[in-house]
Design a protein with these regions (language model features):
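Bacterial N-terminal signal peptides that target proteins for export
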Residues: 1-9
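Intrinsic-disorder-linked linear interaction elements in eukaryotic regulatory proteins
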Residues: 1-2, 15-16, 22
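Bacterial N-terminal signal peptides
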Residues: 8-17
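Short S/T/G/P-rich N-terminal loop/turn motif that feeds into the first structured element of a domain
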Residues: 22-110, 116-119
Length: 119
């Protein structure tokens, strides 16, 4: 009985090791060559993170409808209490164009400031 138990245990360990090795070999990079990832993070008191996240989601929705530069953005809520977003831009140039639009768009700037006020 003990030999059978040890055989099963060894089989499970080998299988888990194989699955982990396979997962490591098949993970795809988050960004392709030339793309740029931008992470926005800021501290936010625990009682205010939900309100801040709702506002960040509204900013992302506004960006999708109004930005002249297309990019992907997802809200982020980190375990250490920080909130923000992760953006994926097609290139350095596209990121700079998005930043220029954000700086010049009064509504976007106000929404961004509102998140800072919440936190």
């Amino acid at each position: 009985m003990n030999l059978r138990y040890l055989s099963y245990l060894l089989y499970i360990v080998l299988m888990i090791t194989g699955v982990n090795a396979y997962a490591a070999e098949t993970l795809e990079p988050v960004a392709k060559k030339g793309q740029v990832i931008v992470i926005y993070r800021g501290p936010c008191p625990s009682g205010k993170t939900k309100a801040a996240m709702r506002k960040i989601e509204k900013i992302i929705s506004y960006e999708r409808k109004n930005s002249p530069v297309s990019y992907s953005s997802s809200p982020g809520n980190w375990e250490d209490g920080q909130v923000g977003a992760v953006d994926l831009h097609a290139s350095q140039s596209a990121m700079e164009k998005a930043f220029a639009w954000q700086e010049s768009d009064k509504k976007w700037s106000k929404m961004y400031d509102d998140v800072a006020k919440i936190c």
